[in-house]
Amino acid sequence: MKIRTTVISLAIAISFVILAACGRTGSSSAEKTIKSTKSGDTTISLSSASGEIKSGENDLTLSFTDAAGKPVDVPAASLKFHMPAMGAMAEMNDVATLTTTDTPGKFRARVNIEAEGSWEAMISFQGSLGTEQATMGVNAK
């Protein structure tokens, strides 16, 4: 009888540990919006786990939604970060590598931002009006 009680107690304890671990994993996947802009009826959002862009390697999400917040199917998109020339510093253009996801209108972006400071995120995509473009100012820390 004592062994049976110990086994049941151990099974319950393991179940709590597994549930706690699953809860932590699920909450870490949420991303925070860095910036959003509109192009026609489409809202374009740039997000990351931290809600920031930093100097160096960045993993971002580029999303396209309609006025109701529903995903807009975008067959092709590009993302480039531009910093104009300043003084002796030449202009910088950091192109993101985009990959599709299982969600329509959502792309994963990987980009190496060369320096801290103000950048212009330049987005081009195939929308309902043909090739559309949008820009948004972002700050790399």
Predicted regions mapped to residue ranges:
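Membrane engagement elements in two modes
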Residues: T5, F16, A30-K32
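C-terminal motif of bacterial Sec signal peptides marking the signal peptidase cleavage site
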Residues: V17-A21
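Contiguous segments within soluble domain cores/interaction surfaces
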Residues: G23-E120, S124-K141
